[in-house]
Amino acid sequence: MDDNSIQQSLLADNPNVLQRKPSEGVNRFRRCRSTPSTDPLQGPPEKGSSVKAKELFKEMRPSFRLVGLLLFIYLLVGVLAFYAVMDEISGKRTNRVLDALYFCVVTMTTVGYGDLVPNNDTTKLLACAFVFMGMAVVALFVSKVADYLVEKQEVLFFKALHTNLKGGETKMLRAIETNRIKYKFYTNALLLVLSIISGTVFLWKVEKLSLVDSFYCVCATITTLGYGDKSFSSKLGRVFAVFWIITSTIIMAQFFMYLAEIYTERRQKMLANWVLTRKMTKMDLEAADLDDDRQVGAAEFVVYKLKELGKINQEEISSFLEEFEKLDVDHSGTLSPYDLTLAQSAQ
């Protein structure tokens, strides 16, 4: 792209754009295009700036019903399949239907205790197919259901603090976005502790394992290590295991994912702090001067800072400028409703 097109797109040479003190009319025009109107004619804001959680988070809620349906179908098909070949699966039995469901869950979560194992080629191939499908279902379940549960807790937490957030809905959303990862991590860590405690106590009291063996079995299960020397052997134990294994392995996977996400976010914040606090140099000014007029306007400065933060790259900037030139039908260096009308009619 030549210098003239860049100059037109950044509007550095247009005296009507990026003035230091834009007129009140311009301010109102820009605000009404980017934020909700504060014009008195539009009516006063709602009393107390009440925020309805259902409306505020309508688009944020993940659609997990399909994932839940896939999980149900997987377990149903798995129970029917393994029930049909249960005679070809060796190990300690309790109930044919329960054992089929238990084996399906152990296979899906890749725990693999070894207390029930396929002993012919047909059941081995069936187990191979179900373990791959099960991992895909678990991955979808992790990304949908866990996020939904944590965001429900965020809504309740911020509704309690709503009276202290005078900025209203916008400020509330900003606060949630800033602390989202931390809340997910802390909530997930608490759920992980509760899962470990509940599994250990159950194995200790119901399966009659020692306290150390119970904790050992829990750790081998939630990490999907599954040595197989300790497992759920009673009928009640396998009923508990069907639900506990699914939830605990999902929680464990989420825990390490959020831990890595917190580390990544911290690195990003350190970079952002360095970019925003360091002093500009002459070399920085030269790099930010996109139109080579020896002056850096507000638009150029913002673009340069975004590039430093890694939020935008040169290819994206070029594509935005190309889009601007296509919309600027009259080549005035600015966009107006008239330009948009002409651009739409030309398509």
UniProtKB/Swiss-Prot annotation:
Impact upon substituting residue 333 to A: Mainly targeted to large vacuole and partly to the ER
Instruction: Describe its function.
Output: Highly selective inward-rectifying potassium channel that is specifically located in the tonoplast of large vacuoles. Functions independently of the voltage difference across the membrane.
**Outcome of mutating residue 292 to G, per the record?**
No effect on targeting to large vacuole
Matches recorded under InterPro entries: 2pore_dom_K_chnl, EF-hand-dom_pair, EF_Hand_1_Ca_BS, EF_hand_dom, K_chnl_dom
Instruction: Reply yes or no: does the keyword RNA-binding apply.
Output: no
Q: Which GO terms describe its cellular component?
A: plant-type vacuole membrane; plasma membrane; potassium ion-transporting ATPase complex
Q: Which family does it belong to?
A: Belongs to the two pore domain potassium channel (TC 1.A.1.7) family.
Record keywords, A-Z: Calcium, Ion channel, Ion transport, Membrane, Metal-binding, Potassium, Potassium channel, Potassium transport, Repeat, Transmembrane, Transmembrane helix, Transport, Vacuole
The record's comment about this protein's domains reads: Each of the two pore-forming region (also called P-domain or P-loop) is enclosed by two transmembrane segments (2P/4TM) and contains the GYGD signature motif which seems to be involved in potassium selectivity.
Impact upon substituting residue 338 to A: No effect on targeting to large vacuole
Q: Which organism is it from?
A: Oryza sativa subsp. japonica
| Binding, Ca(2+) 2 | 328, 330, 332, 334, 339
Task: Please describe the quaternary structure of this protein.
Answer: Homodimer.
Give the way it sits in the membrane: Multi-pass membrane protein
Q: What would changing residue 330 to H do, according to UniProt? A: Mainly targeted to large vacuole and partly to the ER
Query: Where is it located?
Result: Vacuole membrane
Q: Which residues lie on this side of the membrane: Cytoplasmic?
A: 1-65, 146-183, 260-347
Instruction: Give an example GO molecular function.
Output: potassium ion leak channel activity
Q: In which residue ranges is the amino acid composition biased (Polar residues)?
A: 1-11
Protein's UniProt name: Two pore potassium channel a
Q: Binding residues for Ca(2+) 1, per the UniProt record?
A: 289, 291, 293, 295, 300
Q: Which GO terms describe its biological process?
A: intracellular potassium ion homeostasis; potassium ion transmembrane transport
> Intramembrane: which ranges?
99-118, 213-232
Q: Which PANTHER family match?
A: FI03418P, POTASSIUM CHANNEL, SUBFAMILY K
Effect seen on changing residue 313 to S = Equally targeted to large vacuole and protein storage vacuole. Almost completely targeted to protein storage vacuole
**Coiled-coil residues:** none
